[in-house]
């Protein structure tokens, strides 16, 4: 799973960003559950998911602050 550039994320619509954020939060929940039950094989997915979630949240906040001003 390659990390997308910020410019690629900025091209997404607000609905797509929200959908991906919700999907990543669900994925992180599932990964934590798998880790707790010792079923998780690739622990690097935690880092990848957290980074992508942070990037999406940053783009979302940028849009909110630009529309508020």
Curated annotation (Swiss-Prot):
For this chain, one GO molecular function annotation is:
structural constituent of ribosome
Organism whose genome encodes this protein: Synechococcus sp. (strain WH7803)
Name the family.
Belongs to the universal ribosomal protein uL29 family.
Q: Which Pfam families match?
A: Ribosomal_L29 (PF00831)
UniProt keywords, alphabetically: Ribonucleoprotein, Ribosomal protein
Name the record gives this protein:
Large ribosomal subunit protein uL29
**Record's CDD domains?**
Ribosomal_L29_HIP
Key word Transcription regulation present in the record? no
The family database entries (NCBIfam families) matched by this protein are listed as: L29 (TIGR00012)
Q: What is the lineage of its organism?
A: Bacteria, Bacillati, Cyanobacteriota, Cyanophyceae, Synechococcales
Name the GO terms of the biological process aspect: translation
One GO CC term, this protein? cytosolic large ribosomal subunit
Q: Which SUPFAM superfamilies match?
A: Ribosomal protein L29 (L29p)
On whether Cell membrane is a keyword of this UniProt record, the answer is no
């Amino acid at each position: 799973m390659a990390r997308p550039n910020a410019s690629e994320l900025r091209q997404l619509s607000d609905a797509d960003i929200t959908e991906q954020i919700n999907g990543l939060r669900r994925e992180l929940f599932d990964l934590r559950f798998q880790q707790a039950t010792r079923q998780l094989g690739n622990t690097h997915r935690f880092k990848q998911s957290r980074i992508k979630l942070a990037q999406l949240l940053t783009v979302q906040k940028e849009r909110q602050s630009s529309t508020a001003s």
